[in-house]
From Swiss-Prot:
EC nos: 2.4.1.109
UniProt entry keywords in alphabetical sequence: Endoplasmic reticulum, Glycoprotein, Glycosyltransferase, Membrane, Repeat, Transferase, Transmembrane, Transmembrane helix
Entry comment on modification after translation: N-glycosylated.
CDD domains xrefs: beta-trefoil_MIR_POMT2 (cd23282)
Domain MIR stretches: 404-460, 473-529, 534-591
Protein name as catalogued: Protein O-mannosyl-transferase 2
Biochemical pathway: Protein modification; protein glycosylation
Coiled-coil annotated spans: none
Tissue-level expression: Ubiquitous. Highly expressed in the acrosome of cap phase spermatids, in spermatocytes and liver. Isoform 1 seems to be testis-specific.
Glycosylated residues in this chain: N168, N376, N400, N515, N598, N653
Principal cellular location given in the protein's record: endoplasmic reticulum
Name of the gene encoding the protein in the UniProt record: Pomt2
Gene3D superfamilies, A to Z: 2.80.10.50
Function: Transfers mannosyl residues to the hydroxyl group of serine or threonine residues. Coexpression of both POMT1 and POMT2 is necessary for enzyme activity, expression of either POMT1 or POMT2 alone is insufficient. Essentially dedicated to O-mannosylation of alpha-DAG1 and few other proteins but not of cadherins and protocaherins.
């Protein structure tokens, strides 16, 4: 490296002191289109061993278009210093052009000989052949032993069950958008799965049920990650070794392999993320031919992939941000190109709005439309949604139902919180434990329909039965003082000055009394928030609040999950803060009163925009509410890049078939080192260029690849990693894998570039001509051998645990935190 640095300084001195002055001449007339492509490098030619830039042969009849008022550089400057415009009709990979004789006569005589094996046609054939081998190897590793183990592994219990729900058209709730589960259900349906397997818990055997279609679909999409990464790096770096090294890192990573072999959302998500990244890079590379068929194809495919990524998980927002930043940079450069009219810039802006905003948005909304249309039967997710939403679900108690319109004394009702994913006012015979306020009956909110959700509304000062036929019907009105008696336990809704179980400065809410007899702390004043229906309380439509008469607090739910003594239901409190919030607003859902006439609820069904909005509100609240349970394993974001601890997919004992999600440590630690090296080398080069240091022409192409292509990948890694530090929800190891894809691609580009720089610096010596090939080959062999050592983690293992000395995996437990 010292020798390389010496050569660099010598070349710089030669360029600075002895370069002949530039010839001057008249500027060429005519309109010029100067195309600057953000994050993209024009195609250079390099010596495959030394990394030195070479010049292709010069066709005699080709003219060059120069910047206004500038002439070609001196002969010694090389192509890196010329201001050439690619001929219209060619994409950037074919855009390198030579200088014609009438502009620079000496150029034709200055041809650099290139080996026959590195000709463009042979090189392209080698790229395609390698891509075919990479693709076959990727599919072979992902489909190998796909049927093992023949039982549920980890989150297959969730996403396999949700695939069954789609086949059975049963409505359910999940914190993720529906596309991934829809595709899993479709794959199961097309492969003969009938949707009858229960997917109850990990370890349950599939028996005669067809599960290979769903696993095969996920493995199919996971297998395309490697070819996509290969093509992305090849386009960013124009380097076959960099692309091959990237493909090897991902092919031989046990973590990516494991995630791709099971019924999970991760391979589907990563497929769309990588497809979006590849499409973005491809349409950037065709930016010299705007509005052509390939340009439109890749731009549209980028938008489709963005819709797919967001339709699987909200993590897809990160790749949307990356494409958005690239688009802003692209448009900014086009806007600064004075050779382009504002009409042309407007066309570019319109094309990107159509393909990157309108098209993904239409597809995303269509995904939800199909989701709502297919899932039309009542299921376990009903309680997460509003009463009006439930009225559209076949089999729900509100579907095609007829109930009394106005609330009256003596009615049996359910009271539902207006905030999404809070549920129904609920009580049961269990008491609050010692030390948690008064030891009285628990009152909670519960997300599912249950007989313990039923309450009887009564006057505060009367114990007579309002349903007695001899008594006239009396409607409940705004401002009335009432009691709510729990139908199952006959205890009254009650509050007092004891502190709530979880929320400070809120009061405890309990069930109190015997057979409806209690005290003045059972009295509540009912207030109608939206009084456009009058003073009467309308079922489903009226929004009400319950004000405690003694303490003056308002009944609400904090949304916090109670410990096991509260059956992990949600806390109900009486808050002294009387500000109107959705947590303290309720509506009457079910209403039973034989003395009142019924009306149909069909008119209350929501429109599709209302369904779409409510679905997202419920998903967001559900995502934020994912908290770790007692003794549940979680991980922290700083654990992930260092491969600190894996995740047990299947089995725990030495007699079990064990699958352990853990990244290949050689790959992951190499990625981590590469990120650090990139930050150091990239910063050094950027500072040097900013200070005006002129690099030799042979190095300018390499530094552009490192800064532009590597910078794009570093941005992708940061966008898919750092946001997790800000999330309050429960996190798992598998959340890092989209970021890991970007770090692996960055590793391929970085090491290829560094080895080429070493080869250039050591070029006179025999080592200089071999160091690049030897370095790349060493990395490939090391990665392949590490996969040979760690492949049982992905394909399964039986026998003693790694902690046991006699275990064949004992020597591979490099960290104490690895539990396989």
């Amino acid at each position: 490296m010292l020798y390389a640095s010496g050569r660099l300084l010598a070349a710089r001195a030669a360029t600075t002191l002895s370069a002949p002055p530039r010839a001057r001449g008249p500027a060429l007339r005519g309109k010029r289109r100067e195309l600057q492509i953000p994050w993209h490098l024009e195609t250079p030619s390099y010596d495959p061993l030394t990394g030195q830039r070479t010049r292709p042969g010069v066709p005699p009849a080709r003219r060059v278009i120069l910047r206004k008022g500038r002439m070609p550089p001196a002969i010694g400057g090389g192509l890196a210093g010329s201001e050439l415009r690619p001929r219209r009709g060619r994409c950037v990979p074919q855009a390198a052009r030579a200088v014609s004789r009438d502009v620079v006569p000496q150029a034709a005589a200055r041809k650099l000989k290139r080996p026959a094996w590195s000709s463009r046609r042979f090189q392209a054939a080698g790229w395609w052949a390698t891509l075919a081998v990479v693709t076959l190897l990727s599919f072979a590793t992902r489909f190998h032993r796909l049927d093992q183990p023949a039982h549920i592994c980890w989150d297959e219990t969730h996403f396999g069950k949700m695939g069954s729900y789609y086949i059975n058209r049963t409505f359910f709730f999940d914190v993720h958008p529906p596309l991934g589960k829809m595709l899993i259900g479709l794959a199961g349906y097309l492969s003969g799965y009938d949707g009858t397997f229960l997917f109850q818990k990990p370890g349950d055997r599939y028996e005669h049920h067809s599960y290979m279609g769903m696993r095969g679909f996920c493995a199919f999409l996971g297998s395309w990650l490697i070819p996509f990464a290969y093509l992305t790096v090849l386009d960013l770096s124009k380097s076959f070794p960099a692309a091959l090294l990237t493909a090897a890192l991902l092919t031989f990573d046990t973590g990516c392999l494991t995630l791709s072999q099971y019924i999970l959302l991760d391979p589907i998500l990563m497929f769309f993320i990588m497809a979006a990244m590849l499409s973005m890079v491809k349409y950037n590379s065709c930016a010299n031919r705007p509005f052509s068929a390939p340009w439109w194809f890749w731009l549209s495919l980028t938008g489709i992939s963005l819709a797919g990524a967001l339709g699987v998980k909200f993590v897809g927002l990160f790749i949307i941000v990356q494409v958005g930043l690239n688009t802003i940079s692209d448009l900014w450069h086009l806007f600064g190109d004075l050779s382009l009219s504002l009409v042309t810039v407007g066309k570019h802006l319109t094309a990107r709005i159509l393909c990157l905003i309108v098209l993904p948005l239409v597809l995303y909304v269509t995904i939800f439309a199909v989701h709502v249309m297919v899932l039309n039967k009542s299921g376990p997710g009903d309680g997460f949604f509003s009463s009006a939403f439930q009225a559209r679900l076949s089999g729900n108690s509100l579907h095609n139902a007829s109930i009394p319109e106005h609330l009256a004394y003596g009615s049996v009702i359910t009271v539902k919180n207006l905030r999404m994913a809070i549920g129904y006012l609920h009580s049961h015979r269990h008491l609050y434990p010692e030390g948690i306020g008064a030891r009285q009956q628990q009152v909670t909110t519960y997300l599912h329909k249950d007989y313990n959700n039923l309450w009887i509304i009564k006057k505060y000062n009367a114990n007579t039965d309002p349903l007695d036929p001899s008594f006239p019907v009396e409607f409940v009105r705004h401002g009335d003082i009432i009691r709510l008696e729990h139908k199952e336990t006959t205890r009254n809704l009650h509050s007092h000055y004891h502190e709530a179980p979880l929320t400070r400065k809120h009061y405890q809410v309990t069930g109190y009394g015997i057979n409806g007899t209690g005290d003045s702390n059972d009295f509540w004043r009912i207030e109608v928030v939206n009084r456009k229906f009058g003073n009467r309380i309308k079922v489903l439509r009226s929004r009400i609040r319950l004000i405690h008469l003694v303490t003056g607090c308002v009944l609400g739910s904090s949304g916090k999950i109670l410990p096991k003594w509260g059956w992990e239901q949600l806390e109900v409190t009486c808050t002294p803060y009387l500000k109107e919030t959705t947590n303290s607003i309720w509506n009457i859902e079910e209403h039973i009163n034989p003395k009142l006439p019924n009306i149909s609820l069909d008119v209350l069904q929501p429109s599709f925009p209302e369904i779409l909005l409510e679905s997202h509100m419920v998903m967001i609240r559900g995502n934020n509410g994912l908290k770790p349970k007692d003794n549940e394993f979680t991980s922290k974001p700083w654990h992930w890049p260092i491969n600190y601890q894996g995740l047990r997919f299947s089995g725990a004992n030495d007699t079990d078939f064990r699958v352990y999600l853990l990244g290949n440590p050689v790959v992951w630690w190499l990625n981590l080192v590469s990120i650090v090296l990139y930050l150091l080398s990239g910063s050094t080069i950027a500072v040097a260029m900013q200070r005006g240091i002129q690099l030799p022409a042979e190095l300018q192409g390499l530094t552009k690849v490192l800064l532009r292509g590597g910078g794009q990948l570093l941005l992708g890694w940061m966008l898919h990693y750092f946001p997790f530090f800000l999330m309050g929800r429960i996190l798992y190891f598998h959340h890092y894998f989209p970021a890991m894809l970007f770090s692996s691609m960055l590793t391929g580009i970085l090491w290829d570039t560094l080895l080429r720089l070493c080869a250039w610096g050591l070029a006179p010596s025999p080592l200089g001509r071999r160091i690049h090939a030897v370095g790349i080959l060493s990395l490939l062999l090391t990665t392949a051998y590490s996969f040979y050592l760690f492949h049982p983690l992905a394909y399964g293992m039986v026998g003693p645990l790694a902690q046991e000395p006699e275990s064949p995996m004992a020597g591979l437990r490099w960290l104490e935190s690895w539990d396989f």
